[in-house]
From Swiss-Prot:
Belongs to the orbivirus VP7 family. This is Core protein VP7. The keyword Glycoprotein applies. It comes from Broadhaven virus (BRD). It comes from the Viruses.
Amino acid sequence: MDAYTARALSVLEGLAISGDPRSHRDPTTEATMSIFAMRFNSTTSRPVMGRPQRGKRGVITSTPQRCGIRDLEHHVAFVMPGYIQNPQTLAILARDEIPYTPSTFRRVQRYVSARMIIQMCERNDMLTPHYEAVTSPGVVLPAPAGGGPRCYAISATTLQIHIDPMQNEVLTPLIFPDQEDVIMAEFIWQRLANGIDNNAVMNMGTNVELLRDNAAVEGGTPFMATPRGIHVVLASYEPVNLCTIHLTCTRYWVTGPPRVVYDSMEADILAVYTYRDGFWDALRSYVLQALGMPAHHYPTRPVTEFRQNLAIAILSRLFDVYSQWRLRSTLQLRPKVLWWLAHRLQAALRAFRLGR
């Protein structure tokens, strides 16, 4: 079935460039479109042509809709209400004589393997979820009752660490929570010049440094560290004064599914979630909601299901075909371009605000 889906994507891509009568298609695309048009035209009263003439826009836009929706129906039991599908579309796309491009087949392979792929993913949210409360920055707090380092969270990503005079503190177990999926993180440390102790402002010690594998790290310079293998130590050389630093985690990496499965996925997502007009907004919203995806924004978590990734790929190519022929039809209405653009902007804002 991978070849069947690759043929459907190849046909949609070929139909997208058919809007330009001067386009020069590669041999594979030319053969795909020729054979598909020949087989498809024998099963319908609305034939599709390789170079559609003026007035045939309804044919060229309904053909990719049939291919895309039929592919979704085959893979995910998707049903489009009020739409009568050509039952021969599936049989035509399943014929071995219709070629497909290597790029489309490679993308289909990525859709299938998405749920089994694990890679190093960058994140910048809260690294220290075990800190349930935060304290005010600069306030000197006593050591914990049970002993241990004087380390407190002042934000979701920043820790405030006190160190007594002439002491060393190993920071690796403090800055990396006990999470198996954390691979490495990037930090920035800064020395606190003064703080508040007993309702009075006091100067903090200045002779303090942070060591990464026994090498000094300059304050304000980003450095990388790992939970295992790299030792991060805070050393105080002050004879009397207390030293305090702020350690901020700017980003970290964990193992998880990738957000981008194939090469053109980011461009496809942008095309799918672009407001074109009311018809496209309704079609896109219905298909995505039927597959359990948001209608007006891409999911915040990575998409690993084959059917959802396939829907993104198919809808993006339907958007290319639809935009190509809608653009050619609206270019004839030049005196009304400004009114048409203002109307589209108002409709887009209304659709996104209402969350249709």
